[in-house]
Amino acid sequence: MFGKLLTKVFGSRNDRTLKGLQKIVISINALEADYEKLTDEALKAKTAEFRERLAAGASLDSIMAEAFATVREASKRVFDMRHFDVQLLGGMVLDSNRIAEMRTGEGKTLTATLPAYLNALTGKGVHVITVNDYLARRDAENNRPLFEFLGLTVGINVAGLGQHEKKAAYNADITYGTNNEFGFDYLRDNMAFSPQERVQRPLHYALIDEVDSILIDEARTPLIISGAAEDSSELYIKINTLIPNLIRQDKEDTEEYVGEGDYSIDEKAKQVHFTERGQEKVENLLIERGMLAEGDSLYSAANISLLHHVNAALRAHTLFERDVDYIVQDNEVIIVDEHTGRTMPGRRWSEGLHQAVEAKEGVHIQNENQTLASITFQNYFRQYEKLAGMTGTADTEAFEFQHIYGLDTVVVPTNRPMVRKDMADLVYLTADEKYQAIIKDIKDCRERGQPVLVGTVSIEQSELLARLMVQEKIPHEVLNAKFHEREAEIVAQAGRTGSVTIATNMAGRGTDIVLGGNWNMEIDELDNPTAEQKAKIKADWQIRHDEVVAAGGLHILGTERHESRRIDNQLRGRAGRQGDAGSSRFYLSMEDSLMRIFASDRVSGMMKKLGMEEGEAIEHPWVSRAIENAQRKVEARNFDIRKQLLEFDDVANDQRQVVYAQRNELMDAESIEDTIQNIQDDVIGAVIDQYIPPQSVEELWDIPGLEQRLHQEFMLKLPIQEWLDKEDDLHEESLRERIITAWGDAYKAKEEMVGAQVLRQFEKAVMLQTLDGLWKEHLAAMDHLRQGIHLRGYAQKNPKQEYKRESFELFQQLLNTLKHDVISVLSKVQVQAQSDVEEMEARRREEDAKIQRDYQHAAAESLVGGGDEHEAVTAQAPMIRDGEKVGRNDPCPCGSGRKYKQCHGKLS
């Protein structure tokens, strides 16, 4: 109550932010008259003027008003479009490391030109990031004339470009592209073998369109570059035949599992577990098929891989449904994004789940892959010096944007007042009653000529509704992942008089539904249209537009509530753009997933008390509140999972930072001779310590063992025992120095034989290849550690602390092994000439050709001991150093308590 009173007196934080920015809008508007008088040449010259001022020490803030006024005037001349004041506000929000919530139809694409131009003036590059190739190309081509008029270059970064094309795209002032491509390019750059192979510049300013989709929905999906692992498709096929023999355990309203059964499903957590009876049954079936030895347990250490396959098969059969979670197309299982309803070709569930689904559907089973490099969008985008985003629905996730990314959300007002009528939900007892009510509402809308957009949560539901409409002879269009090729065409005409469009959550995000249909698209379909043809098309459209407005505008009809309020708001946001008329309503039933799992008891009890009859709906604020509370519960749970996964992921950030930074230093260095010298002192010294313990008596020395080890691993044949027999005064330290010097002399002889330049190149190639191989193995070890770490909780240990401790130990091993292996290889390999280095490079490029890019969804339960099977386990990612460089004798920033040179600085 007091909070509301204070807001009334002082205004909300959002209001105060906008009030502060409004002063700059006034300054921009004051410049408009003067800028209108400028010639084109004078307006274009502003870009060079701004750059000179920045070079002289001016800040971006000091030139913002003039820069925005320049873009607004250029837009008027190039596009005949003037930025509204609210778009200027949006541009300022985006320049200040914030997220701008701008409603559908408010011109986010044009708004983005303001901060993109301003930040491109620094010459460091601007990345404008969208969710798919179509939107990236469309926005780049649409805005190219404006930016080129102002003297800036525009690049497009999409899938399928070659290295030179990508480098050109990144060197442009403003680069449009998809989040996936930017992430993959970062990974590829950190696998490059020469500076020339890198394509990205340092990450400066990212402006993300549909920021909620990328930073929230995609947050847990790691981008993975992988290579093929061993083929186990036969095992998946054999185990797939076991699952149909299993019976699900009954479940009553008491939430207690009762009755006989082999497995139980927890629908809230989206998990499945074997019962004791189920474990015994599976073991017996495996024994019958000769896959498990008589008397052996599926849970013994030797059978962990078999257990992994059985669990994957059970999840595939019980938790993943065709046409809901995936579709089968061209003999492939393709994941359907639960948030957008779009298919995601190329993405695969990890931990064998995708192969298990392929076995279930009887399609070709692709090999499992081994991770070579990976990063999550969370960690990739946190590396940008400046980060901003825009979307129509961010306010419900404002806390997460602030907590995870440090980004405040500002709700930008609409240019015209919102007049859409959002009606209360109607709740029915059964799905059949709900669908009959939906059909009746659609018929009513068609009678008065009102266009309808029907939003569904799955492909299966959209096809069910389509069948009902065919039965009722209602003309309609279906827009789902199976028919996405016609997406732009269907969305363009979804606002025509009396049209009915059924859409999954994708609902053509990024494309506005224009009342009366899209007249621009009609003109585009004509070859060289005349002015008369254009005028006629526009006049016809105006008549249709007025008819639709008179009928009530676009009517949004939701067939089910999504787990996230944000997705529901996105659907509602399709109507009421730019002050248009419109309406929305959700139809629900007690059989809907959200209602059944989270809100059933309270609402169904209320409905029973009211004594509802068949076909009757309940419409009450209490019901809407109960549903919203259910959605809040799910959102909070999903946020906790994302937060927890990120906490685990952050443990590995230091490691990736060290490896990638060291890799780039190695690649950029002309020579790593000093590094090799430091490493060889450490490696040879460590080997000597094993056979001649420091400060020990000679009786404890193992000289024969040391001689043999030095010869086997470093090709160093030294008469150490002979030295000791002949020289009584040869003590431990001088012996150590003599052995290290002997290795140095042998290596010097190798250098004289092949030439210093060839050996320097070879050293770099060996170091990079060894580091990459060990990093790949380290990633696999970290994956295995993550998958089982939650079990430490049963031993009264903190899984996060255990993960931190053990991952640090694994990294220590990586550093020690790297140094040892590099010196061992350099000692053994005989380099004859430059051709040997080139041959090594050729083999490496051949291996590179075999790697593939994956977007793998992994089960969250492996990390947190439970959770949504659709959640993805985050992967390690590097961070950019915020403060000063750490000195070699300073405490290591990882928190181990050791000096930096003895910890994460060991490689330097």
From Swiss-Prot:
GO terms for cellular component: cell envelope Sec protein transport complex; cytosol; plasma membrane. May bind 1 zinc ion per subunit. It catalyses: ATP + H2O + cellular proteinSide 1 = ADP + phosphate + cellular proteinSide 2. Keywords: ATP-binding, Cell inner membrane, Cell membrane, Cytoplasm, Membrane, Metal-binding, Nucleotide-binding, Protein transport, Translocase, Translocation, Transport, Zinc. Residues 876-908 are annotated as: Disordered. Coiled coil: none annotated. Its EC number is 7.4.2.8. Zn(2+) binds at residues 892, 894, 903-904. Residues 898-908 have a biased composition (Basic residues). GO terms for biological process: intracellular protein transmembrane transport; protein import; protein targeting; protein transport by the Sec complex. Its cofactor is Zn(2+). InterPro entries: Helicase_ATP-bd (IPR014001), Helicase_C-like (IPR001650), P-loop_NTPase (IPR027417), SEC_C_motif (IPR004027), SecA (IPR000185), SecA_CS (IPR020937), SecA_DEAD (IPR011115), SecA_motor_DEAD (IPR014018). It is a peripheral membrane protein. It is found in: Cell inner membrane; Cytoplasm. Monomer and homodimer. Part of the essential Sec protein translocation apparatus which comprises SecA, SecYEG and auxiliary proteins SecDF-YajC and YidC. This is Protein translocase subunit SecA. It comes from Shewanella baltica (strain OS185).
